[in-house]
């Protein structure tokens, strides 16, 4: 994020305030693990942003989600893999936390990868351990749902984070 150099709220410099609220790598990982919805911005065919909200999971340490292969976001990502993702939470100013990830989407229709991401996302959505999903017989349902989907992994190139509870 660019720093304007102008004093921020409370009279401090923007750079100092930004450093104060930036999450550490450990805080970022904990934040991503604790949340489950991400806003995904792709580049539409006319160059305008296309936004959608999806459930996600961390798979191999990377933000990942699955989506219908024919969805606008999947079509956009095949044409132009640039993506910005936003995970945020909090209601009041002092509670606001967020992580913006700008990067490249790596999309695959490999059935095993789609199943792996689908299982992780389903576990995150339901609050159920992946092993328990498998034991409950969810694998077949996830594989059926995955036939029309692709898995998307986000390769981070730039991030910005904030945690107003640090103020």
What are these regions (language model features)?
Residues 36-69, 77, 84-88, 97:
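Short beta-strand segments
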Residues 34-35, 79-80, 148:
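Structured helix-beta-strand junction loops
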Residues 32, 76-77, 121, 154:
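A generic structural signal for nonpolar/aromatic side chains embedded in well-ordered alpha-helices
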Residues 38, 63, 83, 105-106, ...:
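Short beta-strand segments in beta-sandwich/barrel cores
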């Amino acid at each position: 994020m660019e720093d304007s150099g102008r004093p921020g709220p409370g009279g401090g410099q923007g750079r100092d305030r930004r450093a104060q609220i930036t999450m550490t790598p450990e805080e970022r990982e904990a934040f991503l693990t604790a949340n489950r919805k991400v806003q995904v911005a792709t580049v539409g065919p006319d160059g305008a942003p296309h936004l959608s909200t999806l459930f996600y999971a961390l798979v191999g340490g990377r933000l990942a989600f699955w989506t219908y292969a024919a969805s606008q976001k999947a079509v956009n990502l095949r044409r132009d893999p640039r993506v910005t993702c936003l995970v945020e939470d909090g209601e009041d100013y002092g509670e606001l936390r967020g992580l913006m990830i700008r990067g490249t989407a790596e999309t695959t229709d490999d059935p095993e990868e789609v199943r792996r991401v689908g299982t992780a996302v389903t576990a995150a959505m339901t609050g159920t351990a992946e092993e328990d999903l498998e034991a409950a017989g969810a694998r077949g349902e996830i594989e059926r749902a995955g036939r029309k989907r692709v898995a998307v992994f986000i390769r981070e190139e730039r991030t910005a984070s904030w945690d107003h509870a640090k103020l």
